């Protein structure tokens, strides 16, 4: 009598598996997301001489000394976009597996189609589409005015068939659009399920490593903006980037969340035009597009994104509340950080906003997570509360501690130099970040406590 196939219960949100069904996932706490899947042996586990030479593949394992391993770096090649290259750490590494995600309509397919059309003039590329027909892709390329003479296209959703064709074509870069519609014959579940996404991603990663083909996989995102599919998907790939942008804005930000070949949290900025995505070489000029009129509640700070400084504007609106519980709204900043800074301002600055509504926003849709924005945010709120504008040529950065001390931030010299390059002539920074030699024509105020920063603000 044949054995019944093994089954497991897997959460569709996070990929956690359980021996039996339950209503709520213990890992991500989502309800009614656990489904039954049939387990099947992956064909990649079986012995296959074609896949030897990559960790986890078949073949005879050989122990080597670390000193005997060649240190020759794989030569990168450019995508044709300097901002895209920056996010990837300097270009595409042959044999790497890259995952790019983003909301529907963000421009993932457009960016990759533009990239492949540029690279097709120099090397062999392959664009595999499973969501659109070849005619639809051709219409989009024609609308964008892209050179399509040398770009190879394939409409297929079977991973085994795609890899067979890719082995014949031998492209240097291949795009899979998207990983959620691909499937493997030996996995008994529908495309887009946790098991299918996990196995197809592992199959493509192994193919990339053993053939030296760089593969870019397009991934969907969930309602909260994170990459859809099991968490193991992000573990098996080399680089994970997210293309983000507001629906009412033409600017798009490309940020790396994982990168084995470069810096994490590197940021690239693009603008959506009629000819597709165009890179923005000077993002600070966009995020600082302020008018000539000076307004209260606005401050400029320097954030560190990956390997470069970026000037952004923080706006704050403090107004008397008509409700028993005043509102605290933060866009582009952490809500908990705002609550902490309001408490510090009350305790160590002598300013209480218990009866005030507080709204803060980072202009341009940039999300600031580092604590160097603390001092700029506090001064913006004080400026709005007192209805007194900060000078246009003033830049502020610094971390604020719970005791009211102003802590230094990394790369202080580079932040000050970036501000001076854009015409700022005054700066309020932590005392430990004051350079020995300030940029010519720039006045720097070093502060150690919150009270010192408020005193400087009063004297400006």
From Swiss-Prot:
Q: Name one GO biological process term.
A: DNA repair
Null allele outcome, as annotated, is:
Increased sensitivity to methyl methanesulfonate, mitomycin C, phleomycin. Has a modest defect in RecA-mediated conjugational DNA recombination; double radA-radD mutants have wild-type levels. 10- to 1000-fold decrease in survival after ionising irradiation (IR). Double radA-radD deletions have nearly 10(6)-fold lower survival against IR and the double mutant is more severely affected by UV radiation than either of the single mutants alone.
Top EC class, one word: hydrolase
Q: Which organism is it from?
A: Escherichia coli (strain K12)
Q: NCBIfam families, from UniProt?
A: sms (TIGR00416)
Q: Where are the zinc fingers (C4-type)?
A: 11-28
Q: Name one GO molecular function term.
A: single-stranded DNA binding
Tagged with keyword Repeat: no
Binding residues for ATP, per the UniProt record? 102-109
**What is stated as this protein's family in its record?**
Belongs to the RecA family. RadA subfamily.
Indicate what this protein is called per its UniProt record.
Answer: DNA repair protein RadA
Spans traversing the lipid bilayer: none
Q: Where is this region: Lon-protease-like?
A: 357-460
């Amino acid at each position: 009598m044949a054995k019944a196939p093994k089954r497991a219960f897997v959460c569709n949100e996070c990929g956690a598996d359980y021996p039996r069904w339950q209503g709520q996932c213990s890992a991500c706490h989502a309800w009614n997301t656990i489904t039954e899947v049939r387990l099947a042996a992956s064909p990649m586990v079986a012995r296959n001489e074609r896949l030897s030479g990559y960790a986890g593949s078949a073949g005879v394992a050989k122990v080597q000394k670390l000193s005997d391993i060649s240190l020759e770096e794989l030569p990168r090649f450019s995508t044709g976009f300097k901002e895209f290259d920056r996010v990837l750490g300097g270009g595409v590494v042959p044999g790497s597996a890259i995952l790019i995600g983003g909301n529907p309509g963000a421009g993932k397919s457009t960016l990759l189609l533009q990239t492949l059309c540029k690279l097709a003039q120099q090397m062999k590329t392959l664009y595999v589409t499973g969501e659109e027909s070849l005619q639809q892709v051709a219409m989009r390329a024609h609308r964008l005015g892209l050179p399509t003479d040398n770009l190879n296209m394939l409409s297929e959703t079977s991973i085994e068939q795609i890899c067979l064709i890719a082995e014949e074509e031998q492209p240097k870069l291949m795009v899979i659009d998207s990983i959620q519609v691909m499937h493997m014959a030996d996995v008994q579940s529908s495309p887009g399920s946790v098991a299918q996404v996990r196995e197809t991603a592992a199959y493509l990663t192994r193919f990339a490593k053993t053939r030296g083909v760089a593969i870019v996989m397009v991934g969907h995102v969930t309602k909260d903006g994170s990459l859809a599919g099991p968490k193991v998907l992000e573990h098996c790939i080399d680089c994970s980037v997210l293309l983000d942008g507001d629906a009412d804005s033409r600017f798009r930000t490309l940020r790396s969340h994982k990168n084995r070949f470069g810096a994490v949290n590197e940021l690239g900025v693009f603008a959506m035009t009629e000819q597709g995505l165009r890179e923005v070489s000077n993002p600070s000029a966009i995020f600082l597009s302020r008018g000539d009129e000076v307004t209260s509640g606005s401050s400029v700070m320097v954030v560190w994104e990956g390997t470069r400084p970026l000037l952004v504007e923080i706006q704050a609106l403090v107004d008397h509340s008509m409700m028993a519980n005043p509102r605290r709204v933060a866009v582009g900043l952490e809500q908990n950080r705002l609550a902490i800074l309001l408490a510090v301002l009350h305790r160590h600055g002598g300013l209480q906003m218990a009866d005030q509504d507080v709204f803060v926003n980072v202009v341009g849709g940039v999300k600031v997570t580092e604590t160097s924005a603390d001092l700029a945010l506090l001064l913006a709120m004080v400026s709005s509360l007192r209805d007194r504008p900060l000078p246009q040529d003033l830049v502020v950065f610094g971390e604020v501690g719970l005791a009211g001390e102003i802590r230094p931030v990394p790369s202080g010299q580079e932040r000050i130099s970036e501000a001076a390059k854009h015409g700022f002539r005054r700066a309020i920074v932590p005392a430990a970040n004051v350079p020995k030699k300030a940029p010519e024509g720039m006045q720097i105020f070093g502060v150690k406590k919150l009270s010192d920063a408020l005193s400087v603000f009063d004297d400006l």
